[in-house]
């Protein structure tokens, strides 16, 4: 395994599951989860526009030890998970830099506050938008969105 994905994997394996804003692990996990789900849906022939939002339940189904999700993964979900980590880490390196330990969840996970109409007016839009970096994720009470398309994009 190349050094960068290996370092990211080490971080994930030592992670306590906290989605703290200053940590790289939730960012790596979110990008990996998106990559696993995208690759599984693509491999099963599900058109991108028809793909449901990824859920923790479907990810658990794919990665269950009894291989119940193998059809979605081309027969080997562990291999797909490894390829997804490579893809996720490459994508993050392009936007966050080369060192996975220096990445931060709050670089892409923000609470955004903006006026529903004024945001479309060129001069007023930026003046009526506030963003605050935040921790948490879609599976916690501290829910927030992604900046610029998410951790994988």
Q: For each predicted feature, which ranges?
A:
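Acidic, low-complexity N-terminal propeptides/linkers enriched in Ser/Thr/Asp/Gly that mediate export
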Residues: 1-153
């Amino acid at each position: 395994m190349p050094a960068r994905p290996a370092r990211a994997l080490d971080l994930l394996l030592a992670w306590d599951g906290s989605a703290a804003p200053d940590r790289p692990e939730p960012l790596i996990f979110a990008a990996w989860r998106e990559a696993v789900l995208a690759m599984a849906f693509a491999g099963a022939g599900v058109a991108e526009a028809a793909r449901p939002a990824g859920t923790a339940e479907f990810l658990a189904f794919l990665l269950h030890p009894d291989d119940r999700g193998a059809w979605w993964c081309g027969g080997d979900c562990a291999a797909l998970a490894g390829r997804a980590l490579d893809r996720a880490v490459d994508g993050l390196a392009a936007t966050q830099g080369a060192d996975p330990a220096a990445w931060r969840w709050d670089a892409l996970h923000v609470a955004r506050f903006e006026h529903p109409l004024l945001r479309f007016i060129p001069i007023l839009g930026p003046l009526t938008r506030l963003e605050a970096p935040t921790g948490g994720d879609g599976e916690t009470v501290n829910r927030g969105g992604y900046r610029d398309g998410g951790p994988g994009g």
